[in-house]
Amino acid sequence: MHQRALLFSALAVAANAQQVGTQKPETHPPLTWQKCTAAGSCSQQSGSVVIDANWRWLHSTKDTTNCYTGNTWNTELCPDNESCAQNCAVDGADYAGTYGVTTSGSELKLSFVTGANVGSRLYLMQDDETYQHFNLLNNEFTFDVDVSNLPCGLNGALYFVAMDADGGMSKYPSNKAGAKYGTGYCDSQCPRDLKFINGMANVEGWKPSSNDKNAGVGGHGSCCPEMDIWEANSISTAVTPHPCDDVSQTMCSGDACGGTYSATRYAGTCDPDGCDFNPFRMGNESFYGPGKIVDTKSEMTVVTQFITADGTDTGALSEIKRLYVQNGKVIANSVSNVADVSGNSISSDFCTAQKKAFGDEDIFAKHGGLSGMGKALSEMVLIMSIWDDHHSSMMWLDSTYPTDADPSKPGVARGTCEHGAGDPEKVESQHPDASVTFSNIKFGPIGSTYKA
């Protein structure tokens, strides 16, 4: 994900476990989804969702004293990373009451502001202790989404990252929390706002955010490949692969992490920019939005296909295709209107041409490009989230960005939102009731999840 305001992880060090609290039982909201076959028949799967550990109450193992309040650590309980992991526990979640997360059948609704809480990030579970893993290669992933209540500056995201299915418990055996409590997060920004990474707290070097009352930046980050199927609001949308040098989660240190949270964006082992297909950025301003061809005032079905060179589930990723279904009509993705950039799907040729046309540094190719992304797609965890952006106010998605660039230059205009419209303070005060609803998740071979 290009920039992410709210992030996390939690695991444990040998002999210094991150603990599990006993103040509230953890009950995962149920969520059904469908697994389809080549013949187009689908069977219902009984899953559930879990909220990321970074959102959870973190308190002393001995009582209810907070280990973390606002965006600062309790220095007595957390003088260093190892002591903090030993002294502190994450606890169960009140999904609806605290986080504004509700499910019904196949439907998941994420509310933006609930009390003091802002945003959320949920993972699809296979069972109570394990994230659901997906092999996207030679398959397609389909879901319905309602973005009508997502104004400028918000992002209702559905994406995959190469997290460990157990949240890291087997790699760090003293991790007592694991996937059940939403541990193990990583992405291509190598996020440093995570309170726990690889079994240790992230308190050493922690700097509270100057503009986010709930977040800060620590000394470590958590990196892994990320496949952004859907980053969107009612104005703009983007699909973006982000490869990394390693196909699984790794920990980084300081500004060597790169990404949004570091002084040098391209210093790390991942591609923080990715190769994005945003119809508006690719020159088609009438395709996606309120009253447009894909009308964001109504629910839509989003289909994403992962084509391999040899047509097998183990082949090299060669193309990522997108289409929509709305009001019973299949809508092909918009075609690029940018000079010297052709097509309506993501391929190696498209990415190379797009970077050149936009004058962007080709960090995508540096970290393996499309084939590198494909190497990570066999074991991916599904994430659904709602968030605002304390780094760049989501202008990279729905406005003109960089802010000092000429809007008429190719690649600068990404949507119709005005500068400042997505300022987190503004959207949190003016649109606390914003929300996104995902439903009818389907997964299976190419062509099996929708009616042509």
UniProtKB/Swiss-Prot annotation:
Q: Which Gene3D superfamilies match?
A: Glycoside hydrolase, family 7, domain
In this entry, which stretches build a coiled coil? none
From the Swiss-Prot or TrEMBL record, state where the protein is found: Secreted
List GO molecular-function terms, semicolon-separated: cellulose 1,4-beta-cellobiosidase activity
Q: Which SUPFAM superfamilies match?
A: Concanavalin A-like lectins/glucanases (SSF49899)
Which catalysed reactions does the entry list for this protein? Answer: Hydrolysis of (1->4)-beta-D-glucosidic linkages in cellulose and cellotetraose, releasing cellobiose from the non-reducing ends of the chains
Q: InterPro entries of this UniProt entry? A: ConA-like_dom_sf, Glyco_hydro_7, Glyco_hydro_7_sf
Principal cellular location given in the protein's record: secreted
What keywords are annotated for this sequence in UniProt? Carbohydrate metabolism, Cellulose degradation, Glycoprotein, Glycosidase, Hydrolase, Polysaccharide degradation, Secreted, Signal
Task: Name the residues annotated as catalytic in the UniProt entry.
Answer: E226, E231
Q: Where is this region: Disordered?
A: 406-432
Q: Which stretches are tagged as biased composition: Basic and acidic residues?
A: 416-431
The record's GO CC annotations read: extracellular region
Keyword Signal on entry: yes
Q: Does the UniProt entry include the keyword Methyltransferase?
A: no
Q: Write the Enzyme Commission number(s) for this entry.
A: 3.2.1.91
Q: What class of enzyme is it?
A: hydrolase
User: Glycosylated at which positions?
Assistant: N81, N284
GO BP annotations, alphabetical order: cellulose catabolic process
Q: Which residues form the signal peptide?
A: 1-17
- Record family assignment: Belongs to the glycosyl hydrolase 7 (cellulase C) family.
Q: What does this protein do?
A: The biological conversion of cellulose to glucose generally requires three types of hydrolytic enzymes: (1) Endoglucanases which cut internal beta-1,4-glucosidic bonds; (2) Exocellobiohydrolases that cut the disaccharide cellobiose from the non-reducing end of the cellulose polymer chain; (3) Beta-1,4-glucosidases which hydrolyze the cellobiose and other short cello-oligosaccharides to glucose.
In terms of PANTHER family, this protein maps to:
1,4-BETA-D-GLUCAN CELLOBIOHYDROLASE A-RELATED, 1,4-BETA-D-GLUCAN CELLOBIOHYDROLASE B
In Swiss-Prot or TrEMBL terms, this protein is called: Probable 1,4-beta-D-glucan cellobiohydrolase A
Q: What's the gene?
A: cbhA
